[in-house]
Design a protein with these regions (language model features):
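A short, conserved, highly charged catalytic patch centered on acidic carboxylates
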Residues: 1-106, 117
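Charged, structured surface patches that assemble and position nucleic-acid processing machinery
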Residues: 110-111
Length: 117
């Protein structure tokens, strides 16, 4: 299956299941991990996808980004996830804080329906 077909299938799945997805963690498992997989990454390989990667921010130690896509041991894409019903406008600053202390070149804020790069 090519990328376009994978995304179409994921879109259909999201709209079919979303009312049954009650938590952020369930959103990550049902919607966002399949999206990462559709991008061609193995979500179960910690050399490619690191869940809950620590992004210490000045005085806030222990802050974690939901997923970091890795290349050669360095993050290239940070993904911050929210519950599918969350307004992403309320969380822009969180991803920006993580992005500013990382070597990653790209950041993604998503609720599994909307994907903001």
């Amino acid at each position: 299956m090519d990328f376009k077909d994978s995304i179409k299938q994921l879109s259909e799945r999201v709209f079919k299941l979303k009312e049954n997805i009650l938590t952020e963690e369930a959103t990550k498992n049902a919607f966002i991990m399949p999206f990462i997989n559709a991008l061609g990454y193995d979500v179960f390989n910690p050399l490619e996808v690191v869940p809950e990667m620590t992004c210490d921010i000045a005085m806030k130690k222990g802050e974690k980004i939901d997923y970091a896509i890795m290349k050669d041991g360095e993050p290239v894409l940070l993904i911050e996830c929210k519950h599918w019903a969350q307004d992403l406008n309320l969380h822009d600053n969180q991803l920006i804080r993580y992005f500013n202390v990382s070597k990653a070149k790209f950041g993604l804020l998503t609720n599994g329906i909307i994907y903001r790069f």
